Amino acid sequence: MQNAIATIKETNPIVLTVANNVTPADVANGLNALGASPMMSQTPEEADDMVNIAQAAAINLGTLNPHQRGEMEAVMEAAKKYHKPTVLDPVACGATMYRLRVVTELLHQYHFTVIRGNAGEIATLAGVEWQSHGIDAGEGNADLEKVARLAAEKLGSVIVLSGEVDIVTDSTRLARLPYGSPAFKTHVGTGDMLSSLIGAFLATNDDAFDAAVDAVTTFTLCGQAVEDQRPGNWYPGLLNNLDAVTDQQLAAWQ
């Protein structure tokens, strides 16, 4: 990581997020704290204009519905048109046949620069047997590095597999990032925040693998460094750390 955080704080990249209905404020506050500029839309008719002025786009399947799917497709068409990097968060894609069908069709139609999910979600995309548990990772016996590499090879995207140790791979390069905290599980929406924060790093780095590694490292270390890890105090501390963090501070935490 070389001045990645400083670049975001100086350039304020706009990240368009097609959010779910549960965590949009968390996503917006996380982006804003780091120094990026959050933008959200639920209207397919303005997707072209929104993507044109944004530096990256993130799509979240959290509260999937037919209208949201139309917005996703409009955003991805515009991202292809304007050559903007994109992030997919395939929330609970293995939980229902409807979600699996939608995400399969999206991945057939469009290429995503980065895909971030938990073990169950990434295993589903890789075609590996896994017992999903709603939005949570669930259970499985597969080697997670192999699962992530398989998904990257299959989809041609950088894969971020979130867990106790986060895995980032483009199928050739692979990073294991052991900077997490149990507190992340206590606040619904931290995964959504990370997916959109990856967009901010993609906006300022043409190497998608490096950008994803930088994003995961920054976010997880900011969470790990919060002194009070109790749920009610940890989340404000996470935002405070995202706001105050510098490249030098991050290096010291590592």
Curated annotation (Swiss-Prot):
<comment type="pathway">
    <text>Cofactor biosynthesis; thiamine diphosphate biosynthesis; 4-methyl-5-(2-phosphoethyl)-thiazole from 5-(2-hydroxyethyl)-4-methylthiazole: step 1/1.</text>
</comment>
<dbReference type="GO" id="GO:0009229">
    <property type="term" value="P:thiamine diphosphate biosynthetic process"/>
</dbReference>
<keyword id="KW-0479">Metal-binding</keyword>
<comment type="similarity">
    <text>Belongs to the Thz kinase family.</text>
</comment>
<keyword id="KW-0808">Transferase</keyword>
<dbReference type="GO" id="GO:0005524">
    <property type="term" value="F:ATP binding"/>
</dbReference>
<dbReference type="InterPro" id="IPR000417">
    <property type="entry name" value="Hyethyz_kinase"/>
</dbReference>
<protein>
    <recommendedName>
        <fullName>Hydroxyethylthiazole kinase</fullName>
        <ecNumber>2.7.1.50</ecNumber>
    </recommendedName>
</protein>
<keyword id="KW-0067">ATP-binding</keyword>
<keyword id="KW-0460">Magnesium</keyword>
<keyword id="KW-0418">Kinase</keyword>
<dbReference type="GO" id="GO:0009228">
    <property type="term" value="P:thiamine biosynthetic process"/>
</dbReference>
<feature type="binding site">
    <location>
        <position position="162"/>
    </location>
    <ligand>
        <name>ATP</name>
    </ligand>
</feature>
<dbReference type="GO" id="GO:0004417">
    <property type="term" value="F:hydroxyethylthiazole kinase activity"/>
</dbReference>
<dbReference type="InterPro" id="IPR029056">
    <property type="entry name" value="Ribokinase-like"/>
</dbReference>
<keyword id="KW-0784">Thiamine biosynthesis</keyword>
<feature type="binding site">
    <location>
        <position position="189"/>
    </location>
    <ligand>
        <name>substrate</name>
    </ligand>
</feature>
<feature type="binding site">
    <location>
        <position position="116"/>
    </location>
    <ligand>
        <name>ATP</name>
    </ligand>
</feature>
<keyword id="KW-0547">Nucleotide-binding</keyword>
<comment type="function">
    <text>Catalyzes the phosphorylation of the hydroxyl group of 4-methyl-5-beta-hydroxyethylthiazole (THZ).</text>
</comment>
<dbReference type="GO" id="GO:0000287">
    <property type="term" value="F:magnesium ion binding"/>
</dbReference>
<feature type="binding site">
    <location>
        <position position="40"/>
    </location>
    <ligand>
        <name>substrate</name>
    </ligand>
</feature>
<dbReference type="Pfam" id="PF02110">
    <property type="entry name" value="HK"/>
</dbReference>
